From Swiss-Prot:
GO cellular component: COPII-coated ER to Golgi transport vesicle; endoplasmic reticulum; endoplasmic reticulum membrane; endoplasmic reticulum-Golgi intermediate compartment; endoplasmic reticulum-Golgi intermediate compartment membrane; Golgi apparatus; plasma membrane
Coiled coil feature spans: 145-170
Extracellular side: 24-194
UniProt domain GOLD: residue ranges: 43-125
Species classification: Eukaryota, Metazoa, Chordata, Craniata, Vertebrata
Quaternary structure and interacting proteins, as annotated: Homodimer in endoplasmic reticulum, endoplasmic reticulum-Golgi intermediate compartment and cis-Golgi network. Interacts with IL1RL1. Interacts with RNF26; this interaction is important to modulate innate immune signaling through the cGAS-STING pathway.
Stretch forming the signal peptide: 1-23
Name of the protein this chain belongs to: Transmembrane emp24 domain-containing protein 1
Transmembrane segments: 195-215
Family designation: Belongs to the EMP24/GP25L family.
Entry keyword set: Cell membrane, Coiled coil, Endoplasmic reticulum, Golgi apparatus, Immunity, Innate immunity, Membrane, Protein transport, Signal, Transmembrane, Transmembrane helix, Transport
Keyword Aminoacyl-tRNA synthetase included in the entry's annotation: no
């Protein structure tokens, strides 16, 4: 019985994945998207860490608020102003290659004293791949194991598919932002139409009542009736 238990423990230990104690690199930076409410007369900044020699694509869109516009700036980790836009509804900017450090993205609504803005933005990093690991994997495969299939062609096809899938996800996210902006516009227009329609109905009813009262006064005989 003890031998069976020891064998089971040994089997479980062999199945456990190896744990790296030291020398672990930083976790990969993930793409992200964020929607926030920018109050009137306020400026809000965000910081995003980026590795060196990568590609950072920034997309933003104002999906709610009067005017659908906002000021946008993008600064490098060294404080260099890379992008500066004023009163824009949307924008797409790419930084390539990136510097190691924190990039600063600022959205400014200080020009508006009344209307708050609903802003959507997305950060897309070019997924980095360790070239040494890829080369080591390719060298580990013997020529007779490739079955006459070129590894470079396979890697190129996979990379093309990955790029197209990432672009599809990006376009779907943008379409979702466009849909949210259009829905906000339609809801705002519906509220205005309902309000002014109610005002028109109230005015029509008031005019009708006044006309009836006026006509009744015209036909009233105020002369005394002889008895």
């Amino acid at each position: 019985m003890m031998a069976a238990g020891a064998a089971l423990a040994l089997a479980l230990w062999l199945l456990m994945p190896p744990v790296e104690v030291g020398g672990a690199g930083p976790p990969p930076i993930q793409d992200g998207e964020f929607t926030f409410l920018l109050p009137a007369g306020r400026k809000q900044c965000f910081y995003q860490s980026a590795p060196a020699n990568a590609s950072l694509e920034t997309e933003y869109q104002v999906i709610g608020g009067a005017g659908l516009d906002v000021d946008f700036t993008l600064e490098s980790p060294q404080g260099v102003l890379l992008v500066s836009e004023s009163r824009k509804a949307d924008g797409v900017h790419t930084v390539e290659p990136t510097e190691a450090g924190d990039y600063k993205l600022c959205f400014d609504n200080s020009f508006s004293t009344i209307s708050e803005k609903l802003v959507f933005f997305e950060l897309i990093f070019d997924s980095l791949q360790d070239d040494e690991e890829v080369e080591g994997w390719a060298e580990a495969v013997e020529p007779e194991e490739m079955l006459d299939v070129k590894m470079e062609d396979i890697k190129e096809s996979i990379e093309t598919m990955r790029t197209r899938l990432e672009r599809s996800i990006q376009m779907l996210t943008l379409l979702r932002a466009f849909e949210a902006r259009d829905r906000n516009l339609q809801e705002g227009n519906l509220e205005r139409v309902n309000f002014w329609s109610a005002v028109n109905v109230a005015v029509l009813l008031l005019v009708a009542v006044l006309q009836v009262c006026t006509l009744k006064r015209f036909f009233q005989d105020k002369r005394p009736v002889p008895t």
